[in-house]
Amino acid sequence: MKRGEKLDLETAQNEADLVDGGLRYDLTVPLVRFYSNNGANLPNPFKALQIGPVWRADRPQRGRYRQFYQCDIDILGEPSNLAEIELILATTTTLGKLGFKGFEIRINERRIL
C-alpha cells in the first residue's frame, strides 16, 4: 500500500496489508523487536505482559472477528523450564480470577512428557 491510499479492511489479504496500514496483527513480533534492540539495558530475565487489539488479515469466519484482543505473557532470556512453569501458573491464576472453572491446560512438549 502506498502513502495516501486508504486501507480497506474488507480487502486486506495478508499480514503485510495490515502492517502497511499500521494495524497490529500480533503482539509478539513487536515485543521481540523491542527486546532485540534494547536487551542489553533490560533486566534478565525480561518479563512482559501485553493486552491490546489486533487484527486478522484473513476473511473472518463465523465466530471469528476481524479485530480482537490478544493477551500475551512472555519471559525472555530464561533458558530453563522455570519460565514455562511460571507462565502456566500465571495463566491458571488469571483464568481462575476471571471466574473460569474446569479449564484444562495441556502440555505438548516431548522433553517434559
Can you name each region flagged by the protein language model?
Residues 1-113:
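TRNA-recognition modules of translation machinery and tRNA-sensing kinases, especially anticodon-binding
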